[in-house]
């Protein structure tokens, strides 16, 4: 999801614990046993980072995936399962950033969506604000990459190889990691490959209408706004910062529990989400994601992604599909990092993007119809302005931004799986 698009939406509407390790049967298409799917903490003191690990525990390669703006590890579960099921030598780790710990999931105990809806829609949960969490003002790209390096180092344990990838601004984050200077060590030296899914740097989102040129003056103004209390990105705000994520979680749970039952949630939604007439629980998701999506970023093409898959993805809470709170400082820093070079603005913000031209690991880029060709064009620019000697590009213009992650039959696998297989030890 993109910042500028989400701002238009905002104008229109005015701590997680680790789960036990699960050794289960592999999904259809998998060629190996045992199959591990676990959500666990990698530490980090008061603000731990969590990962969803999917695939063979003995795999010698790990693909670390980062979600985009407002995206969480649960949004990557479907893709992680599909990849790990086809690649016996690769385990997939989907990252949950530290801000996911801020969500109050206590109202989701049990499987009663009516009870959960009554609690959350009445505001009977712990809502986080700038006053209660002022420390989030400092959670920018440096913090995100420090946390991500903890994940990468854990993935590298025992001599495993690590490929780093991401979706949307998660792809931007992956490239920033590769170019980052970690106390004299370039980030790309931790990696054996990069995977960019419908995102990146250097005008990757220009085809959608998003071009980022943050001047030093704009950066100073952004920092001042954060210091004045705009700690959380307001792009998805519907009354409260977290309301949109909560509503999607509830809609998913209703659709999983009783897809054909009349939706009691629909009439309680804010106007931009409310369908024009009565719908079923599954019909509410179709209205939101197919018939009348808020923005192109938040849509699916039913030729690729079924409403049942949308429901299952949204219904999960730990990990969930959406972050409840996105740090405004991270929005500012990722926007400023888009030129993928050291600038006066990156210096002002303390962004250590010192090694973009030295990156030398294989790169994969996939684009959907969202960016009208600019995602792959931007990836080609990165390759042309670095030491990358091997790159693969693919795309499907009929797919949406979310289809790349949630598709039941994902065309991206035809080229991403061979790319990752070539990198396996």
Cite the ranges covered by each PLM segment.
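N-terminal export signals
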Residues: 5-25
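Catalytic active-site module of serine/aspartate enzymes centered on a nucleophile-bearing elbow/loop
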Residues: 388-425
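Short, surface-exposed "cap/lid" segments of acyl-processing enzymes
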Residues: 56-110
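Alpha/beta-hydrolase active-site loop
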Residues: 113-155
């Amino acid at each position: 999801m993109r910042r500028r698009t989400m701002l238009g939406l905002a104008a229109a509407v005015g701590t997680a614990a680790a789960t036990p390790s699960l050794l289960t049967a592999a999904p259809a298409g998998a060629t190996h046993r045992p199959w591990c799917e676990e959500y666990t903490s990698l530490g980090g003191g008061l603000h731990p980072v969590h990962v969803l690990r999917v695939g063979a525990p003995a795999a010698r390669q790990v693909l670390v995936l980062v979600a985009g703006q407002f995206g969480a590890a649960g949004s990557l579960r479907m893709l992680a399962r599909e990849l790990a099921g086809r690649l016996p030598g690769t385990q997939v780790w989907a990252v949950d950033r530290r801000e996911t710990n801020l969500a109050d999931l206590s109202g989701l105990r049990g499987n009663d969506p009516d009870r959960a809806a009554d609690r959350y829609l009445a505001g009977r949960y712990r809502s986080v604000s700038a006053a209660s969490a002022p420390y989030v003002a400092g959670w920018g790209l440096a913090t995100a990459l420090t946390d991500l390096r903890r994940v990468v180092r854990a993935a590298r344990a025992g001599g495993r190889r690590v490929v780093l990838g991401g979706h949307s601004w998660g792809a931007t984050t992956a490239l920033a990691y590769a170019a980052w200077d970690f106390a004299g060590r370039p980030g790309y030296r931790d990696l054996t490959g990069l995977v960019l899914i419908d995102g990146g740097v250097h005008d990757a989102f220009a085809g959608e209408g998003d071009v980022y040129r943050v001047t030093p003056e704009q950066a100073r103004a952004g920092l001042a706004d954060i210091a004045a209390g705009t700690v959380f990105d307001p792009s998805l705000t519907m009354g409260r910062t977290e309301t949109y994520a909560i509503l999607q979680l509830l809609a998913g749970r209703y659709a999983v529990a009783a897809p054909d039952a009349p939706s009691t949630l629909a009439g309680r939604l804010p106007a931009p989400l409310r369908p024009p007439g009565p719908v079923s629980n599954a019909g509410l998701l179709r209205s939101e994601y197919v018939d009348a999506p808020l923005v192109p970023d938040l849509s699916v093409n039913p030729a690729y992604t079924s409403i049942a898959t949308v429901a299952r993805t949204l219904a999960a809470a730990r990990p969930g599909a959406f972050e409840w709170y996105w740090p405004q400082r991270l929005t500012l820093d990722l926007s400023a990092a888009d030129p993928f070079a050291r600038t006066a603005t990156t210096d002002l913000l303390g962004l250590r993007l010192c090694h973009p031209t030295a990156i030398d690991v294989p790169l994969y880029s996939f684009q959907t119809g969202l960016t009208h060709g600019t995602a792959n064009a931007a990836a080609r620019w990165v390759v042309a302005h670095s030491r990358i000697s091997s790159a693969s590009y693919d795309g499907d213009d009929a797919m949406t931004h979310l289809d790349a992650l949630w598709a039941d039959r994902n065309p991206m696998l035809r080229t991403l799986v061979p790319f990752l297989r070539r990198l396996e030890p």
